[in-house]
A protein has these predicted regions:
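Protein-protein interaction regions
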Residues: 1-72
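Membrane-proximal intrinsically disordered regions of secretory-pathway and membrane-system proteins
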Residues: 58-259
């Protein structure tokens, strides 16, 4: 569930239920704070949405513009699904989703154009467009996790997270920088070149680990945790770069795939 909060006159989020409960437990969020979920017709008190229970254990709460990406590491993987993806994946896994992403890619280009001018003139990224773009990326991460054999199961069609062990969140900033907006014109130079060079070598290593992981699952039904973490780190690093380039975040992406 993706929850948005109304703080300091701005809609911020999305957050997960666990993150909201952690904020309630830490006292950084008042029980009467207004919250909203896409299934609700109007804003309600946050405790009505997540209940009065507050968790006190450590839960990762992203700062503004921070990208949080998770792919669950399974204790065991299915050999049958692995072989199905290897021999028939292009038919039932790659082509159907890729066709959707081609169409969505056209829409995303228009969204980026609208968002750029909106930030330049108003200092704000339209909330509806922000949610749409984020939801497309959440779908793509869910799909790519299966293509890369990091998760079993078929990725659900549709926008947003689906609670299937793969999730990606970007905490929407309350204010967007016009300066960063203008700087995006030069993003291919100061973002694309340094990060592209690093990711090129990471992706080469990722291809080698993809093959190694395939045979590890085939013979042992287990995907080595360190290899899984590295591959997820590639996704996380790439998504941070995409979030900055597409103005979902003003945080310059770190040169790391670590959480």
């Amino acid at each position: 569930m993706q929850i948005y909060l109304f703080l300091n006159g701005k809609r911020v989020g999305p957050y997960t239920v666990e993150q909201v409960q952690a904020m309630l437990g830490a006292g950084t969020l008042m029980p009467d704070t207004q919250a909203w979920h896409e299934t609700l017709p109007d804003w309600v008190a946050v405790t009505q949405l997540v209940g009065g229970m507050a968790v006190t254990e450590e839960v990762e709460i992203p700062g503004e513009g921070e990208v949080v990406l998770r792919v669950t590491h399974q204790a065991e993987y299915s050999r049958t699904q692995l072989l199905l993806r290897a021999f028939f994946g292009i038919i039932y896994l790659i082509l159907p989703h890729a066709a959707c992403f081609v169409l969505l890619g056209v829409v995303l280009n228009f969204c980026a154009m609208i968002a750029w001018f909106a930030i330049l003139f108003t200092g704000s990224y339209p909330a509806g467009i922000y949610s749409f773009v984020t939801s497309v990326y959440q779908w793509s991460v869910r799909w790519l996790a299966r293509v890369a054999n990091l998760m079993d199961g078929y990725p659900a069609f549709g926008m947003g997270n689906k609670g299937d062990g793969v999730s990606m969140e970007i905490a929407r900033p309350a204010i967007f920088s016009r300066r960063h907006c203008v700087l995006r014109i030069l993003a291919p130079i100061y973002v694309g070149i340094p990060h592209g060079a690093c990711l090129l070598f990471r992706q080469i290593a990722g291809i080698i680990l993809f093959v190694a992981g395939f045979f590890a699952v085939l013979f042992t039904r287990k995907y080595p945790k360190s290899m899984h973490d590295f591959q997820v780190g590639n996704f996380r690093w790439s998504m941070r770069v995409m979030a900055y380039i597409t103005m979902l975040s003003d945080r310059y992406p770190p040169f790391s795939g670590k959480p």
